[in-house]
Amino acid sequence: MTCQILIQIRSDIIKQKYITYWQHTIHHSKKLQFYCIFKHDYKISSYLDLIRNLTNRKDLVKIRISNHKLMIETGRYNQTPHNDRFCPVCNAGIIEDEFHFLLHCPKYSVPRENFYNQIQQNFVDFDQLSYTELITKLI
């Protein structure tokens, strides 16, 4: 075998080992539970090309990787028990996680409805999607 082929084989082995490590890490990390819902393959996500506005792209990345100020995340830093990380925005006694923020919090219902009205035409059976399917489509 040529040196080039050996280098390629070695590179493929290293890449596959890393992908296996990546899959194990995202599926066994509490911090990455939300990320696992929509990220299944080790490849560049299409939203990186679709969202041109840098601020919007950064905001979406922060939600996707749990680099945000929601209580589900900030509670980790100050050791608030998981079941006590309530939404300070609506004060409904509900854990403030990504699902609550994106889909349920009543304080965000108007912008959420405006957004849904804009995107509904892009999805078949939008109203029939489960919360997980909706998050997967939106994120």
Write out the residue ranges for each language-model feature:
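Family-specific functional microsites
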Residues: C3-I139
